[in-house]
Amino acid sequence: MTTKKRECFLSTPLQAVSSLLQVPGVGPVTLERLTQAGISTPQQLVGQFMVLNRSTVAMVSWLKHACSVGGREANIVAEALFAKTERMGVL
C-alpha cells in the first residue's frame, strides 16, 4: 500500500524534506524517540540508514533497540528509506 505521505517523501528531494514527520512511519512519539537518540533531521536518518549499509533489517533492529520504535513503524521507516535511497541512485 502506498500512502500519500510515502509518495510525497519519495518524490521530494532530500534537501527539501525539512521534518522527520515527513518520513513515512514517523509520528510524534517516534519523532521524540529519534530526537532522544540524536537524530533530528531526515538527512541524519538517511545517514544512519547508509551507515547500516542500506539494510532494512539492520535499520528495523536499530530503530527498535536504539529508539524503542514499534515493529510496524520501524518497518515502514526502513522501507521508505530504502526506496528513497534507490530513487537517489545510491548503490
What are these regions (language model features)?
Residues 1-91:
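C-terminal extensions
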